Amino acid sequence: MEPNIPSPVCRKDGVEIHAAAPEGSAEAFSVIAVRENGAWLLVRHSARKTWELPGGHREPDETPLEAACRELYEETGALRFRLCACGCYSVTQGGQTSWGALFLAEAITRGSLPESEIAQVRAFAALPGALTYPTIQPALHACAEKHLRRGALENAPLFRVPVRKEERP
């Protein structure tokens, strides 16, 4: 392990979950494990037949939190939600390491799905077998479940769309 990379708090199938990203690294992605009425919300991209946790690339002017709020709305239609950070994750493939931020959310109010690349939002009791990223998503989901069991959402801040910089906790 490189000296400036924090020790992972969880490791599974090439995915490492860290408390923080190493100095000088930026989380390029925000992924959100979302609960609604006791189930997990997953999304299906219009070009795929598989399911995934909501999330996506961070815009250049966004924080990981702002990206998570935007992606949560764009991909699930969530208008009001509780949201907390679970940590950062790294994925190394082909010698390249990319970093992302993992969040846990509880959707309180959802509206219509905005026009986007998402074809379907569906509630699952557990992760389905047909995942878009089968080596990454289970590790992220396991970490989010651990945070959920520890009560992470109980005192998590309440957000509403749109989230602006002045609303960040």
PLM segments and residue spans:
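Unchanged
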Residues: 58-81, 89-142, 168
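Conserved Nudix-box catalytic region and its N-terminal flanking loop in Nudix hydrolases
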Residues: 35-74
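Charged phosphate-binding loop/patch that engages nucleotide di/tri-phosphates or the phosphate backbone
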Residues: 131-169
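Active-site beta-strand termini and strand-to-loop segments that position acidic
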Residues: 34-37, 105-107
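Acidic, metal-coordinating catalytic segment for phosphate/diphosphate chemistry
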Residues: 1-31
